[in-house]
């Protein structure tokens, strides 16, 4: 039964965008398309290497900006702020954990990939293990994950933001943003994607900083956040329940390993396994590092991205918490009828925390800037995923089906596959709307925890254990897929109960946190890989040479001409600079973890 504790009508009409706001949005889009067209014109787009890897001539700063922007799509803006509103600071651990795996990408994985001379991640798997079935499986799995955890989420989040801010039809908003995003992605390849990502990063950070300052002004500063958040209770609640009460551990990063929503054990071990898949083996991310002109630029890009990944705690998570403080009846609603009124979803409305803050706090002009920021986030993420997914399909699937396909055919297929991915993703949006208690970010991580750990296990063992072979790797992937897919299907068949209802889900769902499940799935898959490899013949020499950490090629592209002593000294100097920055970065990361622990 719902209980109404309000003393007045708390639901006033929201503010709307003005002509000035819309003009700023239009100017931003014009600038964005201009950057895309400029980079497309200067790019080498008529070869597969130029279209998919930007000619391998990118410097560190656009790589770092693109790594950050690619991971900070509108789904993450809305998802992180929404999870912050629902549960507090701990969700920022998903961002801070990236520091260590980004450094692993640059110092461990990229040298392996450069040594193996590959374009896609499944291509590396084929070279390392031999055969075609692992490469084909990983290509298909990557495309499915792109649809279920990336494209559909970003489309939903971006359309939700535009729907709330502009009042446009939800699916009309989706189509318009897709059309603009696909325009320069299809035209310009990876070069256009990386340069527009650099612009998006600047806009995203600037706009988010302004909103964060405005939000803290409303509650009296950071010192007031903990007390204000603890009192952010909606006026209408469900009797005899506590789901409307903010978490007591909301201001802590490390939480109870048994009862917490984000246990510290899962955030330390399970998250690292999932993050290693995303940052070190996922095509969307690795493709940016492979476009670097040399190893130092790849390292510099990872370091810049790692520094930027420290920002979302203050720019997304805390503003989400403040949004619940300011608008508890909308962002913190628990009564289904109230949630339906506030955001159109009965399960909860934490996803509207960020757009609600934008529309209610930002003055005219800046409101338009923030809508542009969210569109920038959407387009940055989508352009990255579109380009990388088309690379996967073209290089790993189409060339297998059509081995004699020419450059023109491959480029055409790469562009057409984007259209197909978009159609499937739009069709999936209604499914994810009601998933995982209305928390978009948790839905994304939950799906990843069921499918990604086996891939991480196969990559890690392939790089560090020379004895791993094709039979062990394939059956490790199949065992992991069987177990992970079973849990995933159960999650869709048995969604989390709404507030006030008993939890009747199977024990594997309510008794095993998805982050802990990721650890178990990783260990299971790894054990099958080891057992299968030991019971079958050793891999051939061609599957080891230049393809493992212990057999790296000695002539990695360092950007130094043979015999150029001065260039060699410069390279060594910048290598030391990268090393010092990596150590400093880890110190900063540990300090923040300790401060908020």
From Swiss-Prot:
Biological role: Electrogenic Na+-coupled sugar symporter that actively transports D-mannose or D-fructose at the plasma membrane, with a Na+ to sugar coupling ratio of 1:1. Transporter activity is driven by a transmembrane Na+ electrochemical gradient set by the Na+/K+ pump. Exclusively recognizes sugar substrates having a pyranose ring with an axial hydroxyl group on carbon 2. Has likely evolved to enable renal reabsorption of D-mannose, an important constituent of oligosaccharide chains of glycoproteins.
Any GO molecular function: D-glucose:sodium symporter activity
Superkingdom, natural source: Eukaryota
Name of this chain's protein: Sodium/mannose cotransporter SLC5A10
Transport keyword on record: yes
Residue ranges, Extracellular side: 1-16, 95-100, 163-174, 223-265, 323-367, 432-444, 494-514
Entry GO terms, CC: apical plasma membrane; plasma membrane
Transmembrane annotation, as ranges: 17-37, 74-94, 101-121, 140-162, 175-195, 202-222, 266-286, 302-322, 368-388, 411-431, 445-465, 473-493, 515-535, 577-597
Family: Belongs to the sodium:solute symporter (SSF) (TC 2.A.21) family.
A Pfam family reported for this protein in Swiss-Prot or TrEMBL: SSF
Record's keyword terms, sorted: Cell membrane, Glycoprotein, Ion transport, Membrane, Sodium, Sodium transport, Sugar transport, Transmembrane, Transmembrane helix, Transport
NCBIfam families on file: sss
Cytoplasmic side: 38-73, 122-139, 196-201, 287-301, 389-410, 466-472, 536-576
Membrane topology, record value: Multi-pass membrane protein
Cell location: Apical cell membrane
Alphabetical list of InterPro entries matching this protein: Na/Glc_symporter_sf, Na/solute_symporter, Na/solute_symporter_CS
Tissue-specific expression: Predominantyl expressed in kidney. Also detected at very low levels in testes, skeletal muscle, and spleen.
Main location: membrane
PROSITE patterns: NA_SOLUT_SYMP_2 (PS00457), NA_SOLUT_SYMP_3 (PS50283)
């Amino acid at each position: 039964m719902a209980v109404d504790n309000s003393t007045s009508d708390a639901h006033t009409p929201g503010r709307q965008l003005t002509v000035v706001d819309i003009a700023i949005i239009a100017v931003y889009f014009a600038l964005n398309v201009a950057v895309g067209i400029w980079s497309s014109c200067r790019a080498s787009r008529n070869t597969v290497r130029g279209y998919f890897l930007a000619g391998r001539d990118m410097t560190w700063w656009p790589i770092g900006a693109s790594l950050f922007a690619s991971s900070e799509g509108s789904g993450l803006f809305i998802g992180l702020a929404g999870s912050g509103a629902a549960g507090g600071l701990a969700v920022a651990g998903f961002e801070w954990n990236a520091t260590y795996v980004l450094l692993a990408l640059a110092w461990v994985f990229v040298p392996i990939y450069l040594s193996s001379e590959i374009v896609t991640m499944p291509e590396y798997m084929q070279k390392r293990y031999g055969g075609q079935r692992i490469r084909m499986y990983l290509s298909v799995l990557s495309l499915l994950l792109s649809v279920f955890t990336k494209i559909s989420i970003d489309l939903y989040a971006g359309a939700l933001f535009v729907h709330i801010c502009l009042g446009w039809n939800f699916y009309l908003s989706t189509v318009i943003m897709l059309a603009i995003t696909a325009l320069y992605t299809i035209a310009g390849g990876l070069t256009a994607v990386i340069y527009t990502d650099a612009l998006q990063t600047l806009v995203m950070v600037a706009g988010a900083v302004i909103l964060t300052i405005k939000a803290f002004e409303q509650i009296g500063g950071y010192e007031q956040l903990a007390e204000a958040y603890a009192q952010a209770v909606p006026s209408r609640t469900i009797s005899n329940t506590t789901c409307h009460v903010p978490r007591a551990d909301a201001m802590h990063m490390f939480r109870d390993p048994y009862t917490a929503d984000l246990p510290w054990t899962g955030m330390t071990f399970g998250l690292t396994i999932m993050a290693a898949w995303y940052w070190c083996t996922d095509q969307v991310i690795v493709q940016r590092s492979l476009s670097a002109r040399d190893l130092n630029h790849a390292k510099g890009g990872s370091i810049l991205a790692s520094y930027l990944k420290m920002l979302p705690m203050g720019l997304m998570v805390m503003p989400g918490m403040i949004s619940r403080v300011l608008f508890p009846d909308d962002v913190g609603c628990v009564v289904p009828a109230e949630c339906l009124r506030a955001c159109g979803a009965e399960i909860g409305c934490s996803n509207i925390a960020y757009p609600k803050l934008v529309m209610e706090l930002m003055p005219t002009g800046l409101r338009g800037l923030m809508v542009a920021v969210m569109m920038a986030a959407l387009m940055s993420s989508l352009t990255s995923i579109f380009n990388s997914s088309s690379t996967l399909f073209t290089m790993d699937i189409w060339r297998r089906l059509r081995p004699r396909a020419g450059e023109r055919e491959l480029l055409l297929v790469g562009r057409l596959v984007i259209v197909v991915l978009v159609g499937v993703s739009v069709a999936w949006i209604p499914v994810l709307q009601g998933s995982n208690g209305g928390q978009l970010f948790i839905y994304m991580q939950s799906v990843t925890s069921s499918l990604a750990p086996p891939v991480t296990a196969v990559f890690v063992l392939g790089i560090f254990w020379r004895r791993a072979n094709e039979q062990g790797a394939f059956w490790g992937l199949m065992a992991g897929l069987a177990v992970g897919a079973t849990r995933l299907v159960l999650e869709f068949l048995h969604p989390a109960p709404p507030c006030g209802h008993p939890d009747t889900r199977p024990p594997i769902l309510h008794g095993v946190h998805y982050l802990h499940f990721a650890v178990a799935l990783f260990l299971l898959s790894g054990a099958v890989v080891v057992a299968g490899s030991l019971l079958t013949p050793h891999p051939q020499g061609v599957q080891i040479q230049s393809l493992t950490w212990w057999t790296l090629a000695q002539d990695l592209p360092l950007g130094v001409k043979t015999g150029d002593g001065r260039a060699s000294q410069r390279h060594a100097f910048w290598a030391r600079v990268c090393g010092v920055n990596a150590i400093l970065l880890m110190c900063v990361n540990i300090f923040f973890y300790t401060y908020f622990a």
